Amino acid sequence: MDIMHGDLRRNGSNQSVPSRHGWIDMEALSPLADQSMPGEWSVGLCDCFGDLHTCCLTLWCPCVTFGRTAEIVDRGSTCCMSGTLYYLLSTIGWQWLYGCAKRSSMRSQYSLRESPCMDCCVHFWCGPCALCQEYTELQKRGFHMAKGISSPPHLPTV
């Protein structure tokens, strides 16, 4: 998709980019806009309630949220295997170690900051919030989480 050439410009309060067919409003291209800002998470750690579906899924079935995220981060590991391992580790209170490893992998892939603190601390103290943040980040990057890695990120067409 070759829509951008030239510099990003401010057009009033909206960010716009030039294309072959005129200026494109970046707010209309949110998945693309999110990818163009390396280092920043698209949602905060405590924004769990922004997506009620993800919040409820994570609250009642964290192994499903984790498995779906891990499948995409690992680019093909099965959702069931990762989710089951997460569940088994949660029975002894060690799921945060596995969550920490996946969060680190995800941050490396997408050049995200280790914020608000170290990955292990985030998963130890705020595990459900971390799972929601990671799941939502991948959604905003265009992944259809229920389909997993078989659905590559989709970008809006212009």
Swiss-Prot record:
Main location: membrane
Cellular component GO terms held in the UniProt record: membrane
Membrane topology summary: Multi-pass membrane protein
Subcellular location field: Membrane
Keyword DNA damage: no
Keywords: Membrane, Transmembrane, Transmembrane helix
Pfam families, sorted: PLAC8 (PF04749)
Protein family membership: Belongs to the cornifelin family.
Protein name stated in the entry: Cell number regulator 11
Protein's organism: Zea mays (Maize)
